[in-house]
Each structure stands twice: as C-alpha cells, then as structure tokens.
C-alpha cells in the first residue's frame, strides 16, 4: 500500500534498534514521496502540515495539544506521544499513545472546560497504573475503552495488580464505563485472544463493538474474575 503522510513525535532520545529500524523505513518511503511531519509541526501548522486532516466529508483527524511537543524536559519518553482525535459527524474517538500522568495533567490544564465526551478512548500505555488518571478521565468522559495489551503478562512485574491492564486503571475507568475490552491474553506458550481484534464502528448516531474472539466485557471475562478478583 502507498503511505500518503506520516505524523510522528516531535522529539525522542531513543537509541534502540527498533527505533532505528523505524527511522530507516520512514526515511525510505519519504524519499519516494510520502509526506512526513512531526506532531509539533501539525499543531503549529508549519512546513505544510495541518492540525486537522479531513479524511472524508464526515471524518476528520485532529492532532491535539501535548505540552511535550514543545517541552523536551520530561524524563519519560512516553510523554512525547502523539495525541490524536478522530471525529465522525458529532462523535469523537481519542488516542493518546503511551501518555503518562505528567502529560495527562498538562493536557487537562490546557483543555479544561472545553473538551467533548468521547465515544472511544484507546487506553493510554496499555492500561498502566501511571496513565488514565482521574482528572483526565473526568475531562474526556469515555463511553468505551479498549486496551491493547497482553493481559497478565509478567514481563515488567510479577505483581499481578500491576500487569496490564492494571488494577488502578480498572478501578478508575469503572467510574465512567463498564464497556472495557482488551485485545490479548498472556500465555507462556503463545499469545491468546481475549477479545481479539476490537472494531468500534459508528453510523453517526449509535456506536457498536465487534471483536474477532468475543465481545465479553473485561469485567465479565474469565481472566478478570479468576486472576484480578
């Protein structure tokens, strides 16, 4: 497929081979005509970039404000995440990458009192304990939340309450919605689907959720009830 435009973070200090591979692949397609902008350029509408991209007559993609497009002092790379919001008619769908509490706090200060409720919130940082904080969730008031994670994976911690999606995320999101879905389930043999691929669709009035494995809400899943509680 042909890539028309790439939008990525405005700053990074990453030296990993994965990041270097991304830069190589990005620069190769840019050399063939793909447009490349940073989130900072988009938000400031510089160098040909736009803050809002109209994908169809009814669908737009907006690059939202993030303090760390401009302030490179955070010691957590996750806060450099590109924050995007899709709009379909009068409905909103929010993606915040791996944004952490520090970035969320700045976001709330910037948009406080002027942010519409969202139909979908793709949980930041895989449903970590350091994202999806109370003030942030109160601002966006999500109807549905989807977690892209390997539920119960102990790669980063052996304490089950801190594996993704974490107990802190679950407790906080539960104040706003029980429509929470997670993609995968950790297994020592191989990854297994929890909900599987999660597709959120809208006709402009109603929003529906379809999954390749099942549409069981996280709170009703066997994993949640046998492992978390």
Which residue stretches match the model-derived regions?
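Active-site HxH/HxHxD metal-binding segment of metal-dependent hydrolases
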Residues: 1-41, 142
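Solvent-exposed, acidic/flexible segments
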Residues: 15, 19, 77, 93-97, ...
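Loop/turn elements at helix/coil->beta-strand transitions in domains of secreted/extracellular proteins
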Residues: 1-5, 30-35, 59, 88-92, ...
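Short, conserved catalytic or adaptor-binding loops enriched in Gly and charged residues
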Residues: 25-31, 52-55, 111-114, 171-174
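A generic structural signal for solvent-exposed, polar alpha-helical segments
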Residues: 25-28, 43, 132, 175, ...
